[in-house]
Design a protein with these regions (language model features):
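Extracytoplasmic catalytic/substrate-binding loops of multi-pass membrane glycan-assembly enzymes
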Residues: 17-56, 320, 340
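Membrane-interface anchor segments at the N-terminal boundary of transmembrane helices
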Residues: 59-68, 309-401
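Juxtamembrane segments of multi-pass membrane glycosylation machinery
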Residues: 44-67, 81-88, 108-113, 352-360
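Transmembrane-embedded, aromatic-rich helix segments that form part
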Residues: 150, 164-182
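Membrane-proximal stem/loop segments at transmembrane-domain junctions that anchor or position
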Residues: 224-342
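Membrane-interface transmembrane helices that cradle and orient dolichyl/undecaprenyl
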Residues: 130-147
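Transmembrane-helix motifs of polytopic, lipid-linked glycan transferases
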Residues: 63-90, 127-135
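Membrane-interface alpha helices of multi-pass inner-membrane proteins
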Residues: 148-162, 200-206
Length: 454
């Protein structure tokens, strides 16, 4: 039966690729050309395929990505099935829940993308995240060294695929700290805590140097990815008033700010043009973010650099990040209140998109789902503190919170950035409900149910 499940998953994903073919989108060219803005792992994956298959590399790419996704879903399904002793029918439901986000982004999102068909880093990040989830759950349930190593490795790979996935490194740190702190008191507890922090710091350092080495080889500069500060300053400019520019001391940076602000104002790219509610603010910034970034900030910087400084693209990116940092330091204290409202609006939509689609009625249901999940998890914890569903739900909520708050700092919380937590949340909810039913059933027949500790 398990082979039938694996075959069904492989058949579904391969058929979706045959039906729709490879998806090339606005960002795809940057991955193919190993752009300075992009993390290294996915461009290297594409380069390897180009070296083997030439210009027809998109077709083996699609097959590999879809097969990888199918296998990852199968492995996570078997892990959950074994831990909760699920029948095959329940394992099939677990697999279907993991497939649904792919259907949702294809048929219910504005971009209409089947993720694992696309030339986007999400196509590699999604199966990697599924395998990270499998290892993180095993780490929570068993805590063996091989699961620590597995979670670490997949955290590093994910962070080298998408910058937002650095949050998995922090989640790993929190898992390990919780395990260490919950252990009996001992002399080595402090050393273990320091060890966890040191390993986490080392992982970030390794990630940074890996990116710099990649850029040295393929872009000729030993530097980190550029454009991060430009992303950060975009929402600050949206949340600012023109007089905030008076706080900028450096003359050229101040002139840049005024020019960018005026361009944004002309296209109504300012909080003043949004509605009063949090949803209105979120809707408006989602419409204006790219307009401000590309047509106001980027256009202003690069036109000036072309005429007065250099036409070298990487140097222009470094200068743009430097100017953006200068703006942020000066205007952030001035625009903090408006920025925070905007940020909360983006986070709100991100939390909704992590488990649903944005719609006035569905938004309320999504918030209710979070509250219900918390209440049911607490009830289960009170009945059976050792239930594996409790840490599973905690992992889901922790990742969703971390992913949403991290992405909202730099850009909009679009569905393709948020869907990683979708399956984990509903799988956790399903397991919490399953465990509660078992507990209530056992209590009803006055028997004690125990599960052998693995």
């Amino acid at each position: 039966m398990h082979l039938i499940l694996l075959f069904s998953l492989l058949l579904f994903f391969v058929l979706m690729f045959i039906l729709y073919g490879p998806g090339v989108y606005n960002d795809s060219d940057q991955y193919i050309k190993m752009h300075i803005h992009r993390e290294p792992l996915y461009p290297l994956f594409l380069k390897l395929l180009r070296d083997f298959f030439g210009e027809s590399f998109l077709y083996p790419m699609g097959i590999i990505q879809n097969v990888f996704m199918a296998i990852a879903i199968y492995l996570l399904t078997r892990t959950i099935g074994d831990r909760f002793k699920l029948p095959v029918s329940m394992e099939a439901l677990v697999a279907c829940i993991q497939v649904f986000p792919h259907i949702m982004t294809k048929y219910f999102s504005a971009m209409s993308v089947f993720v694992t068909n696309s030339v986007m880093s999400e196509a590699l990040a999604f199966p990697l995240f599924t395998l990270w989830t499998m290892n993180a759950l095993k780490l929570l349930w068993k805590g063996e060294k091989k699961h620590i190593a597995g979670t670490l490795i997949f955290s590093l790979l994910l962070s080298l695929t998408r910058g937002q996935m650095m949050v998995t490194i922090l989640v790993f740190m929190l898992i390990m700290l919780c395990r260490v702190i919950s252990e009996p008191q001992g002399r080595r507890k402090l050393l273990r805590i320091l060890g966890v922090v040191a390993v986490t710091a080392a992982l970030f350092i390794i990630r940074t140097y890996a990116v710099k080495c990649y850029n040295l080889v393929y872009n000729g500069r030993f530097i980190n990815n550029t454009y991060g500060n430009v992303n950060l300053v975009t929402n600050m400019i949206y949340a600012s008033d023109r007089e905030d520019g008076e706080a900028i001391r450096e003359e050229q940076t101040r002139e840049f700010f005024y020019e960018i602000f005026d361009k944004a104002w002309e296209i109504e790219g300012n909080y003043s043009f949004s509605g009063d509610s949090l949803m209105d603010r979120a809707d408006h910034i989602e419409q204006m973010h790219d307009e401000i970034k590309f047509n106001c900030i980027e256009d202003t910087f690069y036109q000036y650099y072309d005429k007065n400084v250099t036409t070298d693209y990487i140097t222009q990116n470094l200068l743009a990040d430097e100017q953006a940092m200068g703006m942020m330091k000066a205007i952030f204290p001035k625009c903090f209140k408006n920025w925070l409202v905007t940020y909360c609006g983006i986070v709100y939509y991100g939390l909704v998109r992590s488990i649903a689609v944005v719609h006035p009625l569905i938004n309320i249901a999504a918030v209710g789902s979070y509250l219900l999940a918390i209440v049911l998890t607490v009830l289960l914890w009170k009945r059976n503190p050792k239930s594996p569903a409790v840490p599973m739900m905690c992992l889901a909520l922790l990742f969703i919170a971390g992913n949403t708050t991290a992405v909202a700092l730099t850009i909009m919380c679009l569905s393709r950035y948020m869907i990683y937590g979708f399956a984990l949340f509903y799988l956790s909810g399903l397991m919490v409900v399953t465990e509660l039913i078992r507990e209530w059933h056992c209590a009803k027949i006055n028997k004690t149910c125990t599960r052998k500790e693995e």
